């Protein structure tokens, strides 16, 4: 992103680790530019509710976030990808325009058996939604729209209740921030745009189910280690595993 500042050794650190681990992509610890004691993001996960989770976002930096690990999805805020990955997996899906295109790409990678690494010693600082604003109408509309696209593209044949619960809970957050109209307009826009989406191959349905279930387990493990957010507490109550 153009609102990111990289540590001088960021690139060298990611290249060295990715080469050593044989990873297809790599990302580091991203701190908030305005308060370097808070995490902006680390790695991403996706729930059975078709809602993406940026692990660590808004949490205090702590030893938990200093643990390197294998990851499914790298936030494209600041990440490194092997060129051949785009040849094998495909380019970013331009239907998403902005927001969650990295989630879609990471999910495609994971379905294909590709993975990356989180390297906390590679540090970046991010302004965070500097273009639109974290809860601006445009941001909420874009995310609400793209949640529909993600579900239409990858969640065909998956259990319906987690999707309904996850989307409604996110909508409640939007209403709480006085962005209910933006949320609803985004959902309607998503339904229209989804008609042009390419659906996954039938054989991918089971793979998606496994990947998303494992990813959701990781979300709850992160929540247990760092403290539950209101959204995930409510989601866990509505959608027991």
PLM-predicted stretches and their roles:
Residues 1-5, 95:
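The conserved acidic donor/metal-binding loop of glycosyltransferases
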Residues 4-51:
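Conserved donor NDP-sugar-binding/catalytic core segment of glycosyltransferases
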Residues 231-241:
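A hydrophobic membrane-anchoring alpha-helix module
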Residues 39, 48-53, 59-84, 103-105:
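A recurrent flexible, glycine/aromatic-enriched loop bordering the glycosyltransferase active site
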Residues 14, 72-123:
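A short, conserved alpha-helix in the catalytic core of glycosyltransferases
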Residues 116-219, 228, 232:
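Active-site-adjacent helix/loop segment of glycosyltransferases
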């Amino acid at each position: 992103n153009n609102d990111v500042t990289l540590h001088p050794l960021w690139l060298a650190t990611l290249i060295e680790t990715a080469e050593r681990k044989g990873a297809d992509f790599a990302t580091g610890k991203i701190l908030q530019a305005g308060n370097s004691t808070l995490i902006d993001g680390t790695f991403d996960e996706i729930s059975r509710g078709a809602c993406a989770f940026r692990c660590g976002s808004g949490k205090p930096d702590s030893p938990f976030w200093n643990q390197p690990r294998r990851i499914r999805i790298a936030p494209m805020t600041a990440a490194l990808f092997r060129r051949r990955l785009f040849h094998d997996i495909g380019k970013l899906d331009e239907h998403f325009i902005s927001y969650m295109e990295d989630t879609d790409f990471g999910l495609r990678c994971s379905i294909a058996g590709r993975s990356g690494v989180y390297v906390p010693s590679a540090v970046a600082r991010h302004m965070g939604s500097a273009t639109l604003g974290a809860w601006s109408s445009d941001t909420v509309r874009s995310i609400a729209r793209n949640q529909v696209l993600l579900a239409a593209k990858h969640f065909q044949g998956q259990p319906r209740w987690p999707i309904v619960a996850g989307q409604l809970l996110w909508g409640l957050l939007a209403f709480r921030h006085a962005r209910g109209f933006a949320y609803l307009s985004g959902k309607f826009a998503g339904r229209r745009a989804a008609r042009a989406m390419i659906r996954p191959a039938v054989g991918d349905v089971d793979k998606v189910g496994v990947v998303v279930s494992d990813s959701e387990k990781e979300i709850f493990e992160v929540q247990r280690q760092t403290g539950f957010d209101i959204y995930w507490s409510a989601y866990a109550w509505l959608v027991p595993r």
